Curated annotation (Swiss-Prot):
GO terms for molecular function: 1,4-beta-D-xylan synthase activity; galactosylgalactosylxylosylprotein 3-beta-glucuronosyltransferase activity; xylosyltransferase activity. Involved in the synthesis of the hemicellulose glucuronoxylan, a major component of secondary cell walls. Xylan xylosyltransferase that acts cooperatively with IRX14 to achieve the successive addition of xylosyl residues during xylan backbone elongation. The gene is IRX9. This is Beta-1,4-xylosyltransferase IRX9. It is an enzyme of class 2 (transferase).
Length: 351
């Protein structure tokens, strides 16, 4: 009995030893596959969650996709300063950047705003073609680059007032319509009255621009409205007179060299003693400030008859001050940019 008990105890001891050895072997085997360090399951979980929250955010670009010489230089300076910062080099870089920016500002094209063109159009009451010619003039002025102000002067009429006003509103042109009620027996008196009304309106509101009188039977080269914006005080140009019954063209206007006026083309001379040549109302333009600020151009501020007959005053000033009169176009004053038509009607059209 004693030998059997001893053999059983020895067998149990061996079993325990084998079990302990197996457990130690398994733990050592799996421990060898584990990474070196203090990472744990929880630390791995935190790292994974942090990366997942940051990954959807796209990287921010350093600069725009458009590159210039100035931007590339700035990038090089930033990299060099980050690698080896030095106060002297940073100051030199700032000086170079400022000089480059100043050069770029100088090279930029300076855009100057266009001056206002004020077109005055009187309408003859008895002209049977006035609606057609008014629409044709509107189609021409619509092609002129802004700013442009169209002042239309006509006699008040209940029947035709609505039609002309509606037509002017549909043109898309900035306009002002002036009406009068006076009756005139002379065509020239009616036209002068309408022009004086327009000039008083310009003077009262101090509209600053270049004033041009455009008759309804005028035909324009669109370059004409570009050239008159260059007028400082007074400007003049040649004008061609056309007639349906005559096979010839008569030219009126200045004779000039470059932009200097030397003489005038005269259609006819009624009085040889007349020293001042006649000038057509549509063959000159002037700065509107001569009306409400004459002292700016060396003219007296108060002249008798100026308020009553402004158109006569303007013509007188244009012909008297030759030094401020500029021929257009400046390069070739003989170029025709304005034509005036005469229609074969019993009613005389605007002049």
């Amino acid at each position: 009995m004693g030998s059997l008990e001893r053999s059983k105890k020895k067998a149990q001891v061996w079993k325990k030893a084998v079990i302990h050895f197996s457990l130690c072997f398994v733990m050592g085997f799996f421990t060898g596959f584990a990474p070196a360090g203090k990472a744990s399951f929880f630390s791995n979980f935190e790292t994974t969650s942090y990366t997942s929250t940051k990954s959807p955010i796209p990287p921010q670009p350093f600069e725009n996709a458009t590159y210039t010489q100035h931007s590339l230089l700035n990038r090089t300076l930033i990299n060099s300063q980050s690698q080896a910062p030095a106060p002297a080099e940073s100051r030199e870089a700032e000086g170079e950047t400022r000089s480059l920016s100043e050069k770029e500002d100088e090279n930029q094209v300076k855009v100057t705003p266009r001056g206002l063109v004020i077109v005055v159009t009187p309408i003859i009451t008895k002209d049977r073609y006035k609606n057609v010619l008014l629409r044709r003039m509107a189609n021409t002025l619509r092609l002129v680059p802004p700013p442009l102000l169209w002042i239309v002067v006509e006699k008040h009429s209940d029947g035709e007032e609505k039609s002309s006003s509606t037509m002017l509103r549909k043109t898309g042109i900035m306009y002002r319509r002036i009406v009068f009620k006076e009756d005139f027996t002379s065509l020239e008196s009616e036209l002068d009255h309408q022009r004086n009304l327009a000039l008083r309106h310009i003077e009262h509101h101090k509209l600053s621009g270049i004033v041009h009188f455009a008759g309804l039977n005028n035909i324009y080269d669109l370059d004409f409205f570009v050239k008159i914006r260059d007028i400082e005080v007074f400007g003049t140009w040649p004008m061609a007179l056309l007639s349906a019954n005559r096979k010839r063209v008569v030219v009126e206007g200045p004779v000039c060299e470059s932009s200097q006026v030397l003489g005038w083309h005269l259609r006819k001379i009624n009085n040889e003693t007349e020293t001042k040549p006649p000038i057509h109302i549509s063959s000159f333009a002037f700065n509107s400030s001569i009306l409400w600020d004459p002292e700016r151009w060396g003219r007296p501020s108060s002249v008798e008859g100026t308020k009553q007959d402004s158109i006569k005053y303007v013509k007188q000033v244009v012909l008297e001050d030759d030094t401020k009169l500029k021929g257009l176009p400046a390069q070739d004053c003989s170029k025709i940019m304005l034509w005036r038509l005469k229609f074969p009607t019993r009613t005389r059209l605007s002049t």
